[in-house]
């Protein structure tokens, strides 16, 4: 039975895991572990010759190819933003799909079997558009996405499996590269894992800290040299990499050296950056960012109807929670020390893998009850957002409410679905709109229109409206600008497959060029060693062909390479045959003389010779 893998599709780094023989195991990346601590950085790059790179190779070449490199695409999920790379445009779903495609390939290499099913995590505070975009990305990558689950819930699954026992109320503080989620979860003795509330900020994370460090370095340089390095994309990428490395180092050391030679060139010559960033300075820079975590913590406690003192465990998830200042700030605010035993960088992927094993029936003692993070409403008269499903409602869920018309003889109503906590529809996120037509004409207030919201286990919403008098029914598959149609998904799947085919062809090309180089070398060696056993005309002709082959290799002219390889192989084979026949003829002549000698000497004995060991 094939496995369902768990995927942590992160802003800065991504990881995957799988349950093998009941034990969650992180799937290694083909390039090894990145500095971020997860399997690989969430980078995608396109070279000028059309090659696509994902992960560490994409990150390594970012400085030389800033225009072709994309990172932090997750922050654009659920928007209509397009990444422009040279003469092409890509949606956030496509970029995420390329990352997921790499994970699929790594998982198949690790498990030695096809991997087609996945559980993918999202920040708990992702709205419906963002969740649907994530699911679309998985489909484009070739996955059957069995479940979309919240990252803190996944982390709690990892925790719950390891620490089943007495009932606990756990606050999961998940601070990743681009998002913050604060989730309060109750784990009972079974263990049941029930989400009580969730809150967060989809625009708060480690990348904001990196940006604060970048601004500090850039401002200092601008003050000294009068140049804003942030306007130079190549210099900016170097600054960003240096900032991230310093941030990571300062989790375990008190100072970090930043050394960026030749960061730019002016009329007076090359300019360099050489400075030391202390942990104290880092804490000063990130303090305004860290202070923003209080509001989501308070909101999560309010949603769960709990006080700080009700929390029995604090669980940290995400790379930035390794920063001592972040840990101390949250621990001091809640008045509780964080639990150990869960790797902040692996917990989400492991939890997703556990959920996959639950869906497969491999793990049977976990019941997961998640919640919808934001209130789902319809727009009613005056632009009011009328709630249908409140925030922190356990999912899956189906709820209905009856509405009526606002005007006499109204035969059409517009159902506008929004998500958020603001009282006016215009201030919330619009998820979609549709019309219910054919309503029986009647005075206003008489028709009864039943609107039903249905959220599945992935947290994805479907809405229907029914006129109770006529039975007329209309449904919606969310038509926000970021939702992809089936045709668009299929087109993007084909594009993703084309890149996979491109990778295969690139590998094939490299292997052919390597074989051609080996052939050129071995032929030259053979002809040189043959000496006068090969006539000069033949030798010169073949060496000329080898010269042409080397030129074709250099130019990567694959048609010429293949043609010349075939010709040279045939020619050298003929040379070899002639040399063998010549040697054989000489041997036979020698053998004839030996036979004559044998006939003359009756004492000669035929024997088999064994080589001395």
From Swiss-Prot:
Range of residues in the leader sequence: none
Keyword terms of this UniProt record: ATP-binding, Chaperone, Nucleotide-binding, Stress response
InterPro entries assigned to the protein according to its UniProt record, in alphabetical order: ATPase_NBD, Chaperone_DnaK, Heat_shock_70_CS, HSP70_C_sf, HSP70_peptide-bd_sf, Hsp_70_fam
Residue stretches of biased makeup (Low complexity): 581-597
Keyword Chaperone part of the UniProt annotation: yes
UniProt feature, compositional bias: Basic and acidic residues: 599-613
Region of interest: Disordered: 579-613
Family as reported in the entry's similarity comment: Belongs to the heat shock protein 70 family.
Function: Acts as a chaperone.
PANTHER family: HEAT SHOCK PROTEIN 70KDA
Name this protein carries in UniProt: Chaperone protein DnaK
Taxonomic lineage of the native organism: Archaea, Methanobacteriati, Thermoplasmatota, Thermoplasmata, Thermoplasmatales
């Amino acid at each position: 039975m094939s496995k369902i893998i768990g995927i942590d599709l992160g802003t800065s780094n991504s990881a995957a895991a799988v349950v093998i023989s009941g034990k969650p195991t992180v799937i290694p990346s083909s390039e090894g572990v990145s500095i971020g601590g997860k399997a690989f950085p969430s980078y995608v790059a396109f070279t000028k010759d059309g090659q696509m790179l994902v992960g560490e190779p994409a990150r390594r070449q970012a400085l030389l190819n800033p225009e072709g490199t994309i990172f932090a695409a997750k922050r654009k999920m659920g928007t209509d933003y397009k990444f422009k790379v040279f003469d092409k445009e890509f949606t956030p779903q496509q970029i995420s799909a390329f990352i997921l495609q790499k994970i699929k390939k790594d998982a198949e290499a690790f498990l030695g079997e096809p991997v087609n099913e996945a559980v993918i995590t999202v920040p708990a505070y992702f709205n419906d558009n963002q969740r649907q975009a994530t699911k679309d990305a998985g489909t484009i990558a070739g996955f059957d996405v069995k479940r979309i689950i919240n990252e803190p819930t996944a982390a709690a699954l990892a925790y719950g499996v390891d620490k089943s026992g007495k009932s606990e109320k756990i606050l999961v503080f998940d601070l990743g590269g681009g998002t913050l989620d604060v989730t309060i979860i109750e784990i009972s003795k079974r263990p049941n894992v029930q989400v009580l509330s969730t809150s967060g900020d989809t625009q708060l994370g480690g990348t904001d800290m990196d940006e604060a460090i970048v601004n500090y370095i850039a401002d200092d340089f601008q003050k000294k040299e009068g140049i804003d390095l942030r306007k130079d994309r190549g210099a900016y990428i170097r600054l960003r990499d240096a900032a991230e490395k310093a941030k990571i180092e300062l989790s375990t050391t008190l100072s970090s050296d930043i050394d960026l030679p030749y960061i730019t060139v002016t009329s007076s010559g090359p300019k360099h950056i050489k400075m030391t960033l202390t942990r104290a300075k880092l804490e000063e820079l990130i303090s305004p960012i860290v202070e923003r975590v209080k509001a989501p913590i308070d909101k999560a406690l309010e949603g769960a109807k709990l006080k700080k003192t009700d929390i029995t465990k604090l669980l940290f998830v995400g790379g930035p929670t390794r920063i001592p200042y972040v840990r101390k700030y949250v621990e001091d605010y809640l008045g509780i020390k964080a639990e150990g035993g869960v790797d902040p960088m692996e917990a989400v992927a492991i939890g997703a893998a556990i959920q996959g094993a639950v869906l497969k029936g491999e793990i049977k003692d976990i019941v997961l009850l998640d919640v919808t993070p934001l209130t789902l409403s319809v727009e009613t008269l005056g632009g009011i957002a009328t709630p249908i499903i409140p925030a922190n409602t356990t999912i899956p869920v189906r709820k209905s409410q009856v509405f009526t018309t606002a005007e006499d003889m109204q035969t059409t109503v517009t159902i506008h679905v929004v998500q958020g906590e603001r009282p006016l529809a215009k201030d919330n996120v619009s998820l979609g709109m549709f019309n219910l037509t054919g309503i029986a004409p009647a005075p206003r207030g008489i028709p009864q229109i039943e609107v039903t919201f249905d959220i599945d286990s992935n947290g994805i919403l479907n809405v229907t409206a029914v006129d109770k008098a006529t039975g007329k029914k209309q449904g919606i598959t969310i038509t926000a600008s970021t939702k992809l149609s089936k045709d668009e998904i299929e087109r993007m799947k084909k594009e993703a497959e084309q890149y996979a085919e491109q990778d295969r062809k690139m590998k094939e090309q490299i292997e052919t060029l390597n074989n051609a180089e080996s052939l050129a070398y071995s032929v030259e060696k053979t002809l040189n060693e043959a000496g006068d056993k090969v006539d000069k005309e033949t030798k010169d002709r073949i060496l000329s062909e080898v010269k042409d082959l080397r030129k074709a290799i250099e130019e990567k002219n694959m048609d010429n390479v293949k043609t010349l390889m075939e010709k040279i192989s045939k020619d050298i084979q003929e040379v070899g045959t002639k040399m063998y026949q010549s040697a054989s003829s000489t041997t036979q002549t020698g053998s004839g003389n030996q036979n004559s000698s044998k006939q003359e000497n009756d004492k000669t004995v035929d024997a088999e010779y064994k080589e001395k060991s």
